[in-house]
């Protein structure tokens, strides 16, 4: 099932080509006072995605910046690589939901995936 959530006045990026009506409430994620979104990660939760980003296939335990940059020196110390693919697949752990999140935003997107807090 695909659900669409719209915040503010988004730019038409045409990255979603099928008409999907906006849903009312955002499942799984919690809106934080600072404008960010969070998800409670179980100890065995795994987070996949983000395209060309440093580190291994499980993105948990690090912070990332989705920003298309033409930087030739790639390494573990970089927060962002060339391609920004704002799609996450979150396996919540034993007995919890598996779901995906696609962020359709043309600017920088900052991710803290269990880096500051291992459980968020």
Q: Where are the predicted features?
A:
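Catalytic and substrate-binding clefts that recognize carbohydrates or anionic sugar/phosphate headgroups
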Residues: 1-120
């Amino acid at each position: 099932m695909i659900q669409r959530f719209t915040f503010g006045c988004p730019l038409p990026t045409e990255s979603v080509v099928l008409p999907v009506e906006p849903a009312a409430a955002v499942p799984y994620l919690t809106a934080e006072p600072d404008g960010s979104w969070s998800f409670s990660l179980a100890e065995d939760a795994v987070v996949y995605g983000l395209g060309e980003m440093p580190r291994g296939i499980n993105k948990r335990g690090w912070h990332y910046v989705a920003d298309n940059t033409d930087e030739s020196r790639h390494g573990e110390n970089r927060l962002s690589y060339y391609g920004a693919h704002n799609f996450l697949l979150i396996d919540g752990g034993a007995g919890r939901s598996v779901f995906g999140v696609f962020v359709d935003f043309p600017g920088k997107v900052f991710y803290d995936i269990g880096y500051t807090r291992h459980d968020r």
